[in-house]
């Protein structure tokens, strides 16, 4: 019995060597599944597992069995596919029911050799040397006969009935071995496509609609014959393409001179980590900073209050938005409009006298002005110098207009001195602002570098933004740059 099984296995291995690899992977669908494949455009009766998966995807798309909103859900109730699956719906994220149906309705090429007529017909069509069932039996008998001749003296001759029993068992073992071999190959074919539950439309259209390409920032890579699209947006990384070469070289040299301690590798790491943050800051710098109404950086502390109408205005405004009064201490070269100045120390405008009131025959004193916090110290010194309670001249105010004129003239002189001091300080600040950028030395200083609660206005907006994107520190105090804003000087 052992000799017969051994010879059968040898004949099986010889026949397997004569079968082409393409025919080993081919399967024959059963009639219900074959109708579905033909409805999807398939031709013939022998297919590979990949072709069966392709035509199944085409069938689902043609019949529109999938949900339009959730396309991974396939509703096959009342359809031939639903009858084969034995269920009303399934999800392509879990294609195990579909694979179970294919294992039941696909017959491998080696299993079809159990029918001798079908095997001979397939051999004639494909012009392949595929042995029939009778040839397998004959080769097994010849090998067993030669084996028996060598052991003729030791083993007695078996009866005819026992020979038939041995042949029948031998055929069953042969078919079982072939069926197990091809079933394992069929399982391998399914495992090849079962990659994390890929959807049917991806499997069905992969070969025809997707080709590997590399174009710009979009790449299509292949992994085990399965396409994986990897899309990367590099528009934020290519911002320097829109700038001229001279600006890149000039600013690059200035950045290295400003911060010599930072290496190029550290700059690269910091720039990679802050790509998203720079993109957000660019939106604020380019669009929102151009409008005073939408400026998110202007707080209520920076606004100035008009002394005429008490309205708070933006620090970049020269005149009050409501009453059009000029802001005090704007610039020293501005002509002073005495009729509409919004100032805290007006000393030359007399008030209208109230009609019908008995007043002394002397010049009226000027009403106390609105004192801002920064002018409180100056006014306090002036009040100490001319305290009406301690001054002897206060007793003569009602009787002598000359003494009152003297006091008012001295007060005006002190106010003029304080105004001249503030004007000189403003002139120095204006001269510093009129200097060009400390990096490019071409553009004006309109880029304010913010770090914490302080900032430095030493560069133009273009160079300041380049420093921020490069991850460099402030060229003055070496602090980390948190924000760059554009300053408008009207």
From Swiss-Prot:
Q: Zn finger regions (RING-type) covering which residues?
A: 437-478
Name a single GO biological process: ventricular septum development
Q: What induces its synthesis?
A: Down-regulated by cisplatin (at protein level).
Start and end residues of each stretch annotated as Region II:
246-332
Query: Which parts of the sequence carry Phosphoserine?
Result: 342, 367
Q: Where in the cell is it found?
A: Nucleus
- UniProt region (Disordered), positions on chain: 129-160
GO function terms (MF aspect): enzyme binding; ubiquitin-protein transferase activity; zinc ion binding
Question: Which body tissues produce this protein?
Answer: Expressed in all tissues tested with high levels in thymus.
Q: Which domain of life is it from?
A: Eukaryota
Domain SWIB/MDM2 residues, every copy? 25-108
Chain spans, region Necessary for interaction with USP2: 393-490
Can you quote a single GO CC term?
Answer: nucleus
In this chain, composition skew of type Polar residues spans: 130-143
Protein modification: Phosphorylated. Phosphorylation at Ser-367 promotes interaction with YWHAG and subsequent ubiquitination and degradation. Phosphorylation at Ser-342 also induces ubiquitination and degradation but to a lower extent.
UniProt keywords (A-Z) are: Disease variant, Metal-binding, Nucleus, Phosphoprotein, Ubl conjugation, Zinc, Zinc-finger
Record-linked CDD domains: MDM4, mRING-HC-C2H2C4_MDM4
Tell me the function of this protein. Along with MDM2, contributes to TP53 regulation. Inhibits p53/TP53- and TP73/p73-mediated cell cycle arrest and apoptosis by binding its transcriptional activation domain. Inhibits degradation of MDM2. Can reverse MDM2-targeted degradation of TP53 while maintaining suppression of TP53 transactivation and apoptotic functions.
Oligomeric and partner information: Interacts with MDM2. Interacts with TP53, TP73 and USP2. Found in a trimeric complex with USP2, MDM2 and MDM4. Interacts (phosphorylated) with YWHAG; negatively regulates MDM4 activity toward TP53.
Domain remark from Swiss-Prot or TrEMBL: Region I is sufficient for binding TP53 and inhibiting its G1 arrest and apoptosis functions. It also binds TP73. Region II contains most of a central acidic region and a putative C4-type zinc finger. The RING finger domain which coordinates two molecules of zinc mediates the heterooligomerization with MDM2.
Family under the similarity heading: Belongs to the MDM2/MDM4 family.
Q: Which disease is it linked to?
A: Bone marrow failure syndrome 6: A form of bone marrow failure syndrome, a heterogeneous group of life-threatening disorders characterized by hematopoietic defects in association with a range of variable extra-hematopoietic manifestations. BMFS6 is an autosomal dominant form characterized by intermittent neutropenia, lymphopenia, or anemia associated with hypocellular bone marrow, and increased susceptibility to cancer.
Q: Tell me the protein's name.
A: Protein Mdm4
């Amino acid at each position: 019995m052992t000799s017969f099984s051994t010879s059968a296995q040898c004949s099986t291995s010889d026949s397997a060597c004569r079968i082409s690899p393409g025919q080993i992977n081919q399967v024959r669908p059963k009639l219900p599944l074959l109708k579905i494949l033909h409805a999807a455009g398939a031709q013939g009766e022998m297919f590979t597992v990949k072709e069966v998966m392709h035509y199944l995807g085409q069938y689902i798309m043609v019949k529109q069995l999938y949900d339009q909103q959730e396309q991974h859900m396939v509703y096959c109730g009342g359809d031939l596919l639903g009858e084969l699956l034995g269920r009303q719906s399934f999800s392509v994220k879990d294609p195990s029911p579909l694979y179970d149906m294919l294992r039941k309705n696909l017959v491998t090429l080696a299993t079809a050799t159990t029918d001798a007529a079908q095997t001979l017909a397939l051999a004639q069509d494909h012009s392949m040397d595929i042995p029939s069932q009778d040839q397998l039996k004959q080769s097994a008998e010849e090998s067993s006969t030669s084996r028996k001749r060598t052991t003729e003296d030791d083993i007695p001759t078996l009866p005819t009935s026992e020979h038939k029993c041995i042949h029948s068992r031998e055929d069953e073992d042969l078919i079982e071995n072939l069926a197990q071999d091809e079933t394992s190959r069929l399982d391998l074919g399914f495992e090849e496509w079962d990659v994390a539950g890929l959807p049917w439309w991806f499997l069905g259209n992969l070969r025809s609609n997707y080709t590997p390409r590399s174009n710009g920032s979009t790449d299509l890579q292949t992994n085990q014959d399965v396409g994986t699209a990897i899309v990367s947006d590099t528009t934020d990384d290519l911002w320097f393409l829109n700038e001229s070469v001279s600006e890149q070289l000039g600013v690059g040299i200035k950045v290295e001179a400003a911060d010599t301690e930072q290496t190029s590798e550290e700059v690269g790491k910091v720039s990679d980590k802050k790509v998203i943050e720079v993109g957000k800051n660019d939106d604020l710098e380019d669009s929102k900073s151009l409008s005073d109404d939408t400026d998110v950086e202007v707080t209520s502390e920076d606004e100035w209050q008009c002394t005429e109408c008490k309205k708070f205005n933006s620090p970049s405004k020269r005149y009050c938005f409501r009453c059009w009064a000029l802001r005090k201490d704007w610039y020293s070269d501005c002509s002073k409009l005495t009729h509409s100045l919004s100032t805290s120390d007006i000393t030359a405008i007399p008030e209208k006298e109230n009609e019908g009131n008995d007043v002394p025959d002397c010049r009226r004193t000027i009403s106390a002005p609105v004192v801002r916090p920064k002018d409180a110290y100056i006014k306090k010194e002036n009040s100490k110098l001319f305290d009406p309670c301690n001054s002897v001249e206060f007793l003569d105010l009602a009787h002598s207009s000359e003494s009152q004129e003297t006091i008012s003239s001295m007060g005006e002189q002190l106010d003029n001195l304080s105004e001249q001091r503030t004007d000189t300080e403003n002139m120095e600040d204006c001269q510093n602002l009129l200097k060009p950028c400390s990096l490019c030395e071409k553009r004006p200083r309109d880029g304010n570098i913010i770090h914490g609660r302080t900032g430095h206005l030493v560069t133009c907006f273009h160079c300041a933004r380049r420093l921020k994107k490069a991850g460099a520190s402030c060229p003055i105090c070496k602090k980390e740059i948190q924000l760059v804003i554009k300053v408008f000087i009207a």
